[in-house]
Structures are given as C-alpha cells and as structure tokens.
C-alpha cells in the first residue's frame, strides 16, 4: 500500500 507521499505522486501520474 502506498504511503501518503507516494500516493500523492501516484495521483499526479493518473492525471
């Protein structure tokens, strides 16, 4: 599971 920091970058990746 992604941590908050990694999750935020993952959201940018989806954008």
Swiss-Prot record:
Keyword Isomerase: no
Role description: Snake venom metalloproteinase that disrupts the muscle fibers interaction with extracellular matrix proteins. In vitro, is able to proteolyse extracellular matrix proteins surrounding muscle fibers such as laminin and fibronectin, but does not show any direct cytolytic activity towards the myogenic cell line C2C12 in culture. In vivo, induces a massive degeneration of myofibers, but has no hemorrhagic activity.
Cofactor binding, note field: Binds 1 zinc ion per subunit.
Protein name, UniProt field: Snake venom metalloproteinase Mlp4.2
Post-translational modification summary for this protein: Glycosylated.
GO MF term list: metal ion binding; metalloendopeptidase activity; toxin activity
Broadest EC class assigned to this enzyme: hydrolase
Tissues in which the protein is found: Expressed by the venom gland.
One cellular component term from this protein's GO annotations in UniProt: extracellular region
Any GO BP: venom-mediated disruption of extracellular matrix in another organism
EC number: 3.4.24.-
Assembly mode: Monomer.
Location of this chain's protein in the cell: Secreted
Needed co-factor(s): Zn(2+)
Organism field: Macrovipera lebetina transmediterranea
Notes on activation and inhibition: Inhibited by the chelating agents EDTA, and 1,10-phenanthroline.
């Amino acid at each position: 599971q992604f941590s908050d920091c990694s999750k935020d970058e993952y959201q940018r990746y989806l954008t």
